[in-house]
């Protein structure tokens, strides 16, 4: 499994070669924020319309696969409902990560980009979100290439962890 960072800016997304975009949002998160909000804007409000019409709610366990249209550089868009934001904690974060990784694996997504659950609303810090993501990833055999979407300050915090991981791997290879 490879992990790298992707800016939460549309210009950065336009540089992406392929893969899928995985979006997460809470049932009480309106308007959509972070990556989901940017994708909604790029899709001319399609996600907001789906929510308004009752076809998408953000309920826990909800998932929806959409074509990306011409305005997103991804092969597909997969949306995950996280349920209510109240009570969100690390245990719930971990369960969402396991579920998202399982669905991505079953869908045979070899490459995908996502903003970790709770990052858009600030319910989990960037550094901790990546630490827990890597911890969950270490416990399974899935090998997808993952681009973690975050803002500049979040990327800065996450980059430290990725550099440390890389140094650990290099040291292990030399030993």
Can you describe what each PLM-predicted range is?
Residues 1-175:
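Glycine-/small-residue-enriched capping loops at alpha/beta junctions
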């Amino acid at each position: 499994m490879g992990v790298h960072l992707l800016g939460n800016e549309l210009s950065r997304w336009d540089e992406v070669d392929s893969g899928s975009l995985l979006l997460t949002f809470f049932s009480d998160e309106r308007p959509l924020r972070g990556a989901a909000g940017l994708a909604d804007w790029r899709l001319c409000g399609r996600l907001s319309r789906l929510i308004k019409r009752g076809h998408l709610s953000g309920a826990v366990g909800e998932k929806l696969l959409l074509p990306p249209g011409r305005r997103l550089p991804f092969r597909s868009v997969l949306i995950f409902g996280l349920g209510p934001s109240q009570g969100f904690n690390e245990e719930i974060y971990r369960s969402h990560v396991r579920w998202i990784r399982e669905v991505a694996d079953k869908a045979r997504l070899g490459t995908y980009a996502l903003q970790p659950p709770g990052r858009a609303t600030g319910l989990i810090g960037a550094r901790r979100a990546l630490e827990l993501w890597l911890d969950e990833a270490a416990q399974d055999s899935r090998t997808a290439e993952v681009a973690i979407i975050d803002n500049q300050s979040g990327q800065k915090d996450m980059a430290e962890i990725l550099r440390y991981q890389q140094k650990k791997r290099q040291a292990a290879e030399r030993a």
